[in-house]
A protein has these predicted regions:
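Extracytoplasmic/periplasmic ligand-capture domains
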Residues: 24, 68, 94-125, 133-136, ...
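Bacterial N-terminal signal peptides that target proteins for export
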Residues: 1-7
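Bacterial N-terminal signal peptides
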Residues: 8-17
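Active-site-proximal polar cores
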Residues: 505
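Cleaved targeting-peptide boundary
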Residues: 24-30
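N-terminal lobe/hinge region of extracytoplasmic solute-binding protein
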Residues: 33-84, 115, 184-187
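Surface-exposed binding/hinge segments that line
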Residues: 25, 92, 126-170
């Protein structure tokens, strides 16, 4: 009873604080809610969706993407010209374009970003892997040469252009280890990060030097909540205006909430079961059960997993069954793999029998040569759907003699486990985990790159290495003929399905929601007509086009001038709810912040 009283008081305090009394500055504020915040906001070391949501509003690309159809559109560059042999692209930058701090944007910023930032970052290096030289004959001209034709240089060079006069003051070692940008974070986008309160708020304010049309909102507030339930509750209470990523478990409920519109759209994203395949040569100090590197074991696990059931239960039917590395979102490149691993427990048992994995005396976990088919399965505490999927994988594989010990850890801990290094070499400390990847909406290259050898130490999380896959990757990246490229990509997908560094469980939809009494009906973009409403991992155009409803229609927008006190009280309310056990809780162990789920 006492806990409920505290909750009521806390919520009352929040609602009182959120009243229009705090709208005296008259600013229009777009309030976004999330349960997971960026780690450092450094493009050198971070790779999570939340980072991209902020980066894409803070920084421009050399060439942007139209939110209508994802075609190339001016960014830092005003125009570009491709040579007849398609190996040289000359870019002309906008004249008079300035960073948010007033410094001019020049070709040297592009040169720094593509020569220093991208190759040394965790995620962006693949976009410039074919670049042989970058010349800057004057402040407004950039000439990029490649070793082979690469369509991504114009149509998919997704590497943010950073201000060299800011980032260039740090050494590469500092940038890739310890450096964290601090507000105001100099940028070229419509808003820049002006305030960071860890665990509470990231405030973005309008960039006075933004080149494009002035956006309707003066500020964007990214408000941190304790978990996804709290985020979605805040939307129904009107504390926030938009949830850019809604959980599958609550999507149907939000769709029925008053003054809330829930939006479902296709996306180039999937959720996968990942196996640690790092070789001793590449990862001499890695920690994992060697049995996980037996391909027959991985194939048997794939046959034992009912992907349809995982979608129905874990994703609440909002996703689709996974069929290999590429989602069918990429219609120009998708073709069902040669081996799709339909549910077949008998086939799974047969594979393990033939590989010499024998049932133990009690008929439980299989064994061979002193090894048991018992693996850790890590999953993020921030994702209820992933936790449910992990439990289902454990249940589904028990009949074939495989035992998964599900370990729920924070996203920071899982990142640490999967990216651990010793003496400069990768040393991942896991057997398996469940997480997900989102590809570029305009090209499958980013997802294909995940399984290349050169991605190890960067975006690779399975540490898969196959020279034939690498050769095919290089071949397709320089192929401009769509039909020929599709045939090469098909070979890559079949290789990945044979070796199974990933078992793709589901192809995920983009699920979002917004307040109809706060936000004027937005366009569905990236691409039109049935894409999402923010497109905020690709660029800023869709968010910059959002508008509050008119004052006559309900006064939305102007009452968004919420003070810092409101966010403190919101956090207090969430804390009280957690203490009362009314929200999803997360227990931690001191040694690994993990909870082993025995049941």
């Amino acid at each position: 009873m006492r806990a409920r009283g505290l909750v009521a008081l806390a919520i009352a305090g929040v609602m009182a604080a959120a009243a229009p009394a705090f709208a005296q500055d008259g600013k229009k504020v777009l309030r976004m809610g999330w349960a997971q915040e960026p780690q450092t906001l450094s493009p050198f070391v971070d790779q999570d969706e939340e980072d991209f949501r902020v980066w894409s509003l803070n920084y421009d690309l050399l060439v942007n993407f139209s939110p209508e159809d994802l075609s190339p559109t001016p960014g830092i560059a005003e125009s570009w010209e491709v040579s007849p042999d398609k190996r040289t692209v000359t870019f002309k930058l906008f004249e008079g374009h300035k960073w948010s701090d007033g410094q001019p944007i020049t070709s040297k910023d592009v040169e720094y970003s593509l020569e220093t930032f991208a190759p040394n970052s965790l995620l962006f290096g693949s976009y410039v892997e074919n670049v042989t030289s970058i010349d800057t004959p004057d402040d407004l001209t950039v000439v990029i040469k490649t070793k082979q034709p690469d369509a991504r240089i114009v149509g998919g060079l997704f590497a943010y252009i950073l201000p060299a006069h800011v980032w260039g003051k740090q050494s590469v070692k500092q940038l890739t280890t310890s450096y964290k940008p601090t507000p105001p974070i100099v940028g070229s986008g419509p808003w820049i990060v002006s305030e960071i309160r860890r665990g509470r708020l990231i405030r973005m304010t309008r960039n006075p030097n933004f080149r494009g049309e002035k956006p309707a909102y003066d500020e964007i507030h990214w408000i941190k909540y304790g978990n996804t339930d709290a985020v979605e509750r805040a939307l129904t209470l009107g504390e926030i205006d938009v949830v850019p990523e809604v959980q599958q478990a609550t999507f149907a409920r939000l769709a029925k909430a008053p003054d809330v519109e829930a939006v479902q759209s296709s996306s180039p994203s999937f959720t996968q079961l990942t196996f640690n395949l790092c070789s001793e040569e590449i990862c001499p100090d890695a920690k994992f059960d060697p049995a996980v590197q037996d391909r027959s074991v991985r194939q048997a696990i794939a046959y034992a997993i009912d992907r349809k059931r995982i979608n129905e239960i874990a994703s609440r039917g909002t996703a689709f069954e996974g069929h290999g590395l590429l989602p069918d979102y990429y219609k120009a490149f998708y073709e069902q793999p040669a081996e799709d691993y339909p549910l077949d427990v008998d086939k799974a048992n047969q594979l393990l029998d033939e590989a010499g994995w024998e049932r133990s005396d009690d008929g439980g976990v299989r064994e061979k040569g002193g090894q048991r088919l018992s693996f850790d399965l890590f999953v993020r505490s921030e994702s209820p759907a992933n936790i449910q999927a992990a439990r289902l994988v454990r249940e589904m594989t028990q009949p074939i003699g495989v035992d998964f010990k599900v370990q729920v850890v924070s996203v920071d801990k899982l990142t640490e486990i999967t990216t651990r290094k010793i003496d400069g070499k990768m040393a991942p400390d896991f057997d398996t985990f469940i997480w997900g990847w989102g590809g570029d909406p305009y090209d499958p290259g980013l997802l294909l790159n995940l399984l290349t050898t050169k991605a190890i130490g960067g975006s690779s999380d399975a540490f898969y290495s196959n020279p034939e896959y690498d050769r095919l990757y290089d071949q397709q990246s320089g192929e401009f003929d769509e039909a020929r490229r599709k045939a090469i990509v098909k070979q890559m997908i079949d290789l990945a399905q044979r070796d199974l560094p990933y078992v793709v469980l589901t192809v995920d939809s983009a699920l979002q929601a917004y307040r109809t009494d706060k936000l004027a009906e937005p366009k569905r973009v990236c691409p039109e007509p049935d894409g999402d409403i923010t497109c905020d991992q690709v660029g800023y155009a869709a968010v910059a086009a959002l508008e509050p409803v008119s004052a006559a229609a309900g006064g939305g927008g102007d009452d968004g001038g919420t003070s810092g006190l409101v966010y403190v009280l919101i956090a207090v309310a969430a804390g009280a709810l957690l203490a009362a056990g009314l929200l999803l809780t997360r227990r931690r162990r001191a040694d690994r912040e993990a909870v082993e789920l025995e049941k």
